Amino acid sequence: PSNVVELFKQFNCKILLSSDPNISGKFITSLIFGTCKGSGTANAGMYMGYAKELLEFLEAEAKTKCKDDQLNFNTLCRSRDDIKVDENHVIFENFKPTQVNNESNAPFVSYPGSPGLSRYSRAVTEYAQFVYIYILCLLIVSMVFLPQHKNLLVTTTVAATAFYALFADKSCTV
């Protein structure tokens, strides 16, 4: 559309990031990726801005130790005042895989592919680093309040710890 530049200028920023559709729910999405300045969570799939600032932003993202670009985008977004998230879908809209109504007035729209077993298994190894401590705490508290299930809970705790130690990506937490 011919008015994209004018729409972008109305945001009064140097970089505009698309808003995450919170596929896992707002709490889990915020827990894993954080937010951009306390507002919505930025999605790394669609963005626009001025060339100089975009180059600086993308170079900074490439230098981070964390392998997750979306977490990096949100972390960098919090450290810069010239970045905003298109929370009202004026320019960008990301749809959830489960959304039935896929109509949008946004000039740029993203429709996710069909999530399969490989995507879900990859998500478990990638995102375990963000939720492992909560799962571990829940299992320990469960042992205290459910002593009759102690054997199962201890086994689950050992298995979860072994999985985390052997397979989970820890690039964002170490």
Where on the chain are the PLM-derived regions?
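Conserved donor-nucleotide/metal-binding helix-loop-beta segment in metal-dependent transferases, i.e.
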Residues: P1-C36
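Short, flexible coil/linker elements and helix-boundary hinge sites characteristic
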Residues: N12, F33, D81, L146-H149, ...
